[in-house]
């Protein structure tokens, strides 16, 4: 431990103690808050089913930075490189298209065995796994509909895919001793004015009920559903809207997924957390950064990321909120993207844990909004960076931008040699 770091740490402890904050307790709590990293940043959502196929479903990864992972071994190696440079507990979020098989597997036939390598890798790296059915980039999703499709056979295919995905998710939870959160997102919608908005939603409701009909151990598997405002090619109508899934999660008591980029640009999910928690048992968050639309830019340590973290901490939602990331930027080093976004999420959580929330609540209850605003702003100047640096030190990860040197070395030695 360097003398400079130790001195900064001791001063920070004193400064935070003066406002009633135990920084050691804040770090202990941070160690109980895993962030689920998304595998698809590493290969631009290509997956291993058909890596050369085009990405569909109204989503888009832009850029062509060299070094993209081309197979599971490369993706796992890249993830390990990123995770070494991110302090504290982590999980990995997988999509169904990241299965491994020597022969083609239809999506409605995926099985736990196709993800055995991921489970063994997660065990070796002390990670939990989360999961997602992949209802996009497939011939049977080409017309823009999956679980709400008017064709019974196509709709059944996607129902069976989601059913099979739930069994994979339960396998993750059983093997790893921590529940897998399986999130259902579908791209279903229409480009232009839609006359019958009801029938697709009726079909989706019935399809989802069939998907979750098999009872699974909640210690192994958690169902979540995710809404979206629009996608490319589905600008006018999205079957799985916010109102649809809020109603579904409430009535079926599933988890609700709130994605930072899936609402109108003037809406923020930080304001939705406390409202949704009144009605649903658990929330899954997809922390992202929408720029004018659901662009999935790398997460920053900005006001909204901080507000999301603060909502979790202020309302003691540690056991009810699952924190996941969802961005994919192909214009920069993909490993750096993981590191920047995940470290920023963890920094936001730490800053929230260092807030004198009890004192702020008292001021708010007393109607002293002047003092509330003053303390909130002064809090921003307290030396949280010194606490972060100590946290990184304890987890044997670089505290500042030194991590970039490791990424550059890995890029030179490994990424640059990929075709």
Curated annotation (Swiss-Prot):
GO terms for cellular component: cytoplasm. It is an enzyme of class 5 (isomerase). Its cofactor is Mn(2+). Its main location: cytoplasm. Pathway: Carbohydrate degradation; L-rhamnose degradation; glycerone phosphate from L-rhamnose: step 1/3. Mn(2+) binds at residues 262, 294, 296. Pfam families: RhaA (PF06134). Keywords: Cytoplasm, Isomerase, Manganese, Metal-binding, Rhamnose metabolism. It is found in: Cytoplasm. Homotetramer. This is L-rhamnose isomerase. It comes from Escherichia coli O157:H7.
């Amino acid at each position: 431990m360097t003398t400079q770091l130790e001195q900064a740490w001791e001063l920070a402890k004193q400064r935070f103690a003066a406002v009633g904050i135990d920084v050691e307790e804040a770090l202990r709590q941070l160690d109980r808050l895993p962030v689920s990293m998304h595998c698809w940043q590493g290969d631009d959502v290509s997956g291993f089913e058909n890596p050369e196929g085009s990405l569909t479903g109204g989503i888009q990864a832009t850029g062509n930075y060299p070094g993209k992972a081309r197979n599971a071994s490369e993706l796992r190696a890249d993830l390990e490189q990123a995770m070494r440079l991110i302090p504290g507990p982590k999980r990995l979020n997988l999509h169904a298209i990241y299965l491994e098989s020597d022969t083609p597997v239809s999506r409605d036939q995926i099985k736990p065995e196709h993800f055995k390598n991921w489970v063994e890798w997660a065990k070796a790296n002390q990670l939990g796994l989360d999961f997602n059915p992949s209802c996009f980039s497939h011939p049977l999703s080409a017309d823009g509909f999956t679980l709400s499709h008017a064709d019974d056979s196509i709709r059944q295919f996607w129902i069976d895919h989601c059913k099979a995905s739930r069994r994979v998710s339960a396998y993750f939870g059983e093997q790893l001793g921590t529940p897998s959160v399986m999130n259902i997102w579908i791209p279903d919608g229409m480009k232009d004015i839609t006359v019958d908005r009801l029938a697709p939603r009726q079909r989706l409701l019935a399809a989802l009920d069939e998907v979750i009909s098999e009872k699974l151990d909640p210690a192994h598997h958690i169902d979540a559903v995710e809404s979206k405002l629009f996608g490319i090619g589905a600008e006018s109508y999205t079957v799985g809207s916010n109102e649809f899934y809020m109603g579904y999660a409430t009535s079926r008591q599933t988890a609700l997924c709130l994605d930072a980029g899936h609402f109108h640009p003037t809406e923020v999910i930080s304001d939705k957390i406390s409202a949704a928690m009144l009605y649903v048992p658990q929330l899954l968050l997809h922390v992202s950064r929408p720029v004018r639309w659901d662009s999935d830019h790398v997460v920053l340590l900005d006001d909204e990321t901080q507000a999301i973290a603060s909502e979790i901490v202020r309302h003691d939602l540690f056991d009810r909120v699952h924190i996941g990331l969802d961005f994919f930027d192909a214009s920069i080093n993909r490993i750096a993207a993981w590191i920047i976004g995940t470290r920023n999420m963890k920094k936001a959580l730490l800053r929230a844990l260092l807030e004198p929330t009890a004192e702020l609540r008292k001021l708010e209850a007393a109607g002293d909004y002047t003092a509330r605003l003053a303390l909130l702003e002064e809090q921003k100047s307290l030396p949280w960076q010194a606490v972060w640096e100590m946290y990184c030190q304890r987890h044997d990860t670089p505290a500042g931008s030194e991590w970039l040197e490791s990424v550059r070395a890995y890029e030179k030695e490994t990424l640059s040699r990929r075709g």
